[in-house]
Curated annotation (Swiss-Prot):
<dbReference type="GO" id="GO:0000301">
    <property type="term" value="P:retrograde transport, vesicle recycling within Golgi"/>
</dbReference>
<keyword id="KW-0333">Golgi apparatus</keyword>
<comment type="function">
    <text>Required for normal Golgi morphology and function.</text>
</comment>
<comment type="similarity">
    <text>Belongs to the COG2 family.</text>
</comment>
<comment type="subunit">
    <text>Component of the conserved oligomeric Golgi complex which is composed of eight different subunits and is required for normal Golgi morphology and localization.</text>
</comment>
<dbReference type="InterPro" id="IPR009316">
    <property type="entry name" value="COG2"/>
</dbReference>
<dbReference type="GO" id="GO:0000139">
    <property type="term" value="C:Golgi membrane"/>
</dbReference>
<protein>
    <recommendedName>
        <fullName>Conserved oligomeric Golgi complex subunit 2</fullName>
    </recommendedName>
</protein>
<dbReference type="InterPro" id="IPR024602">
    <property type="entry name" value="COG_su2_N"/>
</dbReference>
<keyword id="KW-0472">Membrane</keyword>
<dbReference type="GO" id="GO:0006886">
    <property type="term" value="P:intracellular protein transport"/>
</dbReference>
<dbReference type="GO" id="GO:0005634">
    <property type="term" value="C:nucleus"/>
</dbReference>
<keyword id="KW-0813">Transport</keyword>
<dbReference type="GO" id="GO:0006888">
    <property type="term" value="P:endoplasmic reticulum to Golgi vesicle-mediated transport"/>
</dbReference>
<keyword id="KW-0539">Nucleus</keyword>
<keyword id="KW-0653">Protein transport</keyword>
<dbReference type="GO" id="GO:0017119">
    <property type="term" value="C:Golgi transport complex"/>
</dbReference>
Length: 191
């Protein structure tokens, strides 16, 4: 290696470490910052040099940020107060949402209670309807028995009435009144 080559290599190292090579203006170019492009442009710089350059750039950006805050302090304070006001509004909204959720839970519980009550009432109504049907059929059976008692077997509707009475007795055979009149019906069948 000649002295000229050594000087040339030394100049190259000096160029890499100089502010001319580590130009921060490239960070200010239009468009988004590309870490890949930055690292490719610094590929000949050693790791320590890259760390030093990044530390220096960080300090520079930090100082510029502080200068911006200092120059625009009133705007910065106003931004902080707007953020605080926004946080207050968000807190108010959150508490309103929590109250609404609680009201919805209470409404849901109330709705479930009303739904259960309605189902019970519908079941009771159905039971009452069934009882009315039983009572109506038992009244019909009583009328049929009175008809059978007051008419003899030669009447044209007598046999049909007897069959209807038997059908009703079979349907309600477990009812106490039907059990009590079964002997009477058996007597009519024997005639």
């Amino acid at each position: 290696m000649t002295e000229k080559d050594a000087d040339s290599g030394s100049d190259l190292v000096d160029a890499f470490l100089s502010d001319a090579y580590l130009n921060t203006e490239e960070l200010r170019k239009d468009g988004p910052f590309s870490p890949d492009e930055f690292l490719v442009s610094k590929r000949f710089l050693g790791l320590d040099g890259l760390v030093n350059e990044l530390s220096r750039l960080f300090e520079q950006v930090n100082n510029e940020l502080m200068l911006l805050v200092k120059d625009n302090y009133q705007d910065f304070v106003h931004l902080g107060s707007r953020m605080k006001s926004g946080n207050t509004k968000v807190s108010t909204l959150i508490s309103s949402i929590h109250r609404s959720e609680e009201q919805l839970k209470n409404s849901k519980q109330s709705l479930i209670g009303h739904s259960t009550e309605i189902q019970n009432n519908l079941k009771h109504k159905q039971d009452v309807e069934n009882e009315k049907l039983i009572a109506s059929n038992l009244l019909l059976l009583d009328q049929i028995l009175k008809f059978l008692k007051s008419n003899d077997s030669s009447h044209p509707l007598w046999l049909e009435s007897l069959n209807n009475a038997q059908r009703l007795c079979d349907t309600y055979k477990d009812h106490p009144w039907v059990q009590s009149i079964s002997p009477t019906l058996i007597n009519y069948i024997k005639h």
